[in-house]
C-alpha cells in the first residue's frame, strides 16, 4: 500500500472514531482498527484505498486502468464487434504508459484515451453511425475507448482491403492505419515516406514492420 493510500485509510479510521496514528504506515495498530469496524465501514475504506491511485491519476490528467480491467473488457468487446483481442494487446502498450499492474493514459490535450484519438477521428466514427459518447467523455472511459479502437480497426481494414486486394491486414498494418490515418498510411506503404514521423520508438518500429510486411507480400 502506498503512503498516500495508508494516510487515506488512517484518516478515514480516525473520522470513524478509531484511535490510530496517521503516519502513512499500515502496521498492527492500523490493521487492528480496521478489523474492529463493522463490515460495511471496512468495505468502504478498502474501496476508497483501491480507488485513490485512479483518482490521483485523473487529477494529473491521466487515468489508470488495471491489466485485469483491460483484459476483461477486451475479451468481451473484441468478441462482440469482431476485432481480434490480440490487436488490442498489440496496440495498447504502444499508445499508453505501461505501469505496474496496468496502463495509464492521458485524458486531456489533443490525443486522448487508450487509443490516443484526436477529436477529428473520434467524431468521424460517430458520424459513421458508431455508438460512442462525446469525445471528452468517451476518451476517458475504458469501454468507449476500446469500442473506438475496434471501430477504427474495422474501418481501416475495409480501406486497406479495397486498396490492396488480397493482402493480409496484419496487426502492424492495422496499427499503421490507426497511427497515421488511412490516406497517409497508404502513401507510406507505397512510397516509404512517413507523413507524421514524430513518433515514439515503439510506434516507429511498428509502422516500419508494417511496410516491410506489405512490401514482402508484394514480392511473394
From Swiss-Prot:
One of its GO terms (molecular function) is hydrolase activity. One of its GO terms (biological process) is killing of cells of another organism. Muralytic enzyme exposed to host peptidoglycan layer after membrane fusion during viral entry. Functions as an exolysin that cleaves the peptide bridge formed by meso-diaminopimelic acid and D-alanine. Also lyses the host cell late in infection to release the virions. Optimum pH is 8.5. This is Peptidoglycan hydrolase gp5. Belongs to the peptidase U40 family. It comes from the Viruses. The gene is P5. Inactivated at temperatures above 20 degrees Celsius. One of its GO terms (cellular component) is virion component. Monomer. It is found in: Virion. Keywords: Cytolysis, Degradation of host cell envelope components during virus entry, Degradation of host peptidoglycans during virus entry, Host cell lysis by virus, Hydrolase, Viral release from host cell, Virion, Virus entry into host cell. The lineage of its organism: Viruses, Riboviria, Orthornavirae, Duplornaviricota, Vidaverviricetes.
